[in-house]
């Protein structure tokens, strides 16, 4: 968890990971920020939903800043040791188009935020952000907790890799983002993968109902 990222902290530094009020807030803050300002965007430890998402957002913000907020900077604090999706493409694009805008930093997990001073801290720096987009570490939703499918201390749900049946509770199947990569392999948490998992799972469930080995 990130120190200070409670309700007040989230109000100042929204994740804006799902479309809605927070994405509108982030846009409005970017529009209102004066030229020469500093935007800070954090990337959580993987795995998380939509691996290229934070880097796509960084590219869009950088493009906006370059066109409309001259002299502004975007500091990308990546918790990971490198860009974890399409890294070569993003780095090439950033170097070519936004080298004067993007300051990309690896191994820079956010450990603390101070909403009163708009400060975002890593183990190396304290950065004052005119606009802050802090995306915290992700886990499976509260729904799986209500069903008891996520073991304590784990972020995702372990499943059988052939049937997607929970290894915690029999006859319950989990697909998509909620599955644990240590049991399904290093597949991205994407819509395409979830769709594919659903088809495999449906076939497995039919086989199980009919007493056929999967």
Describe every region a protein language model picked out.
Residues 4-35, 117, 127-196:
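FAD-site-proximal beta/loop scaffold in flavoenzymes
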Residues 21, 52, 56, 85, ...:
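Conserved active-site and cofactor/substrate-binding residues in soluble primary-metabolism enzymes
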Residues 22-72, 82:
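Rossmann-like NAD(P)H-binding beta-loop-alpha module
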Residues 33-37, 98, 205, 209:
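Sec/Tat-exported extracytoplasmic proteins
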Residues 46-69, 157, 165-186, 197, ...:
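Active-site substrate-recognition segment that forms the wall
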Residues 63-158, 212-213:
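A Rossmann-like FAD-binding core segment of flavoenzymes
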Residues 192-214:
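Internal hydrophobic alpha-helix adjacent to the cofactor/substrate pocket in enzyme cavities
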């Amino acid at each position: 968890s990130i120190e200070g990222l409670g309700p007040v902290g989230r109000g100042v530094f929204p994740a804006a990971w799902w479309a809605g009020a927070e994405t509108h807030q982030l846009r409005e803050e970017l529009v209102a920020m004066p030229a020469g300002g500093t935007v800070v965007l954090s990337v959580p430890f993987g795995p998380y939903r939509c691996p290229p998402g934070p880097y796509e957002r960084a590219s869009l913000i950088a493009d906006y800043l370059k066109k409309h907020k001259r002299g502004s900077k975007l500091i990308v604090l990546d918790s990971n040791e490198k860009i974890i999706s399409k890294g070569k493409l993003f780095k090439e694009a950033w170097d070519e188009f936004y080298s004067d805008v993007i300051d990309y930093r690896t191994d820079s997990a956010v450990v603390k935020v101070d909403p009163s001073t708009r400060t975002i801290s890593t183990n190396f720096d304290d950065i004052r952000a005119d606009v802050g987009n802090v995306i915290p570490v992700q886990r499976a939703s509260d729904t799986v907790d209500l069903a008891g499918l996520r073991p304590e201390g784990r972020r995702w749900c372990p499943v059988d890799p052939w049937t997607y049946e929970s290894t915690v509770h029999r006859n319950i199947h989990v697909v998509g983002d909620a599955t644990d990569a240590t049991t399904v392999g290093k597949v991205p948490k994407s819509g395409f993968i979830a769709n594919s998992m659903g088809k495999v799972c449906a076939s497995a469930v039919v086989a199980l109902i009919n007493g056929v080995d999967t």
